[in-house]
Amino acid sequence: MRVAGAAKLVVAVAVFLLTFYVISQVFEIKMDASLGSLFARSALDSAIRSTKPPRYKCGISKACPEKHFAFKMASGAANVVGPKICLEDNVLMSGVKNNVGRGINVALVNGKTGDVIDTKYFDMWGGDVAPFIEFLKTIQDGTVVLMATYDDGATKLTEEARRLIAELGSTSITSLGFRDNWVFCGGKGIKTKSPFEQHIKNNKDTNKYEGWPEVVEMEGCIPQKQD
């Protein structure tokens, strides 16, 4: 009886050890597979991150150098989609912000700090040009001025208004016509003509939309005003 009992004990221990061994092997295989999947997924995520193109402020195509403000802007599309003005990854004016309108849309920015001073739009089709002229006269030296048309930005413009905008560095303002698309970035006190200006004429033979030219876009880096 003692021999039979001992034999049963030996068998039970052997079965236990065998079961433990099998379970440990299966667990180890699963663990290896899980770790392998984890490392493979991490490597894939790293590869995706390394191949993803970098995003620059306002979505411009390349980074601006130090002491420059990144900007991107677009005119309105016909009389349907309003213009958009972005500076340093901050959308200053857009249809989503509900602060744009028919005519000339203007954003004023401190040329030293990049802080927004004011945003306004002036109706140059059914409005009065006088408030626009007074607004232009109040702009202080060192202010960055960004302008974009929507629908029609020229019908009510007078020679005085055009002259004041030209003093901000614009070249195309003298020829801006009915329903032309135009974007401009200049500054009060600028000594030369601004390199940041795009203008597309309203031409029935080349217009993208019925009665309006295509949207005009522009991006760049504005030098920060130094003391």
Curated annotation (Swiss-Prot):
Keyword annotations for this protein, in alphabetical order, are: Cytoplasmic vesicle, Developmental protein, Disulfide bond, Lectin, Oncogene, Secreted, Signal
From the Swiss-Prot or TrEMBL record, what is one GO molecular function term?
Answer: cytokine activity
Location of the GG-type lectin domain: 67-225
This entry carries the following GO cellular component terms, namely:
cytoplasmic vesicle; extracellular space
Its signal peptide is 1-24
**From its record, what is one biological process in GO terms?**
inflammatory response
Domain of life according to the entry = Eukaryota
Q: Where in the cell is it found?
A: Secreted; Cytoplasmic vesicle
What S-S linkages are listed for this chain? C58-C86, C64-C221
Q: Which PANTHER family match?
A: UNCHARACTERIZED FAM3
Q: Which family does it belong to?
A: Belongs to the FAM3 family.
What does the UniProt record say this protein does? May be involved in retinal laminar formation. Promotes epithelial to mesenchymal transition.
Q: Could you identify this protein by its name?
A: Protein FAM3C
Q: What is the lineage of its organism?
A: Eukaryota, Metazoa, Chordata, Craniata, Vertebrata
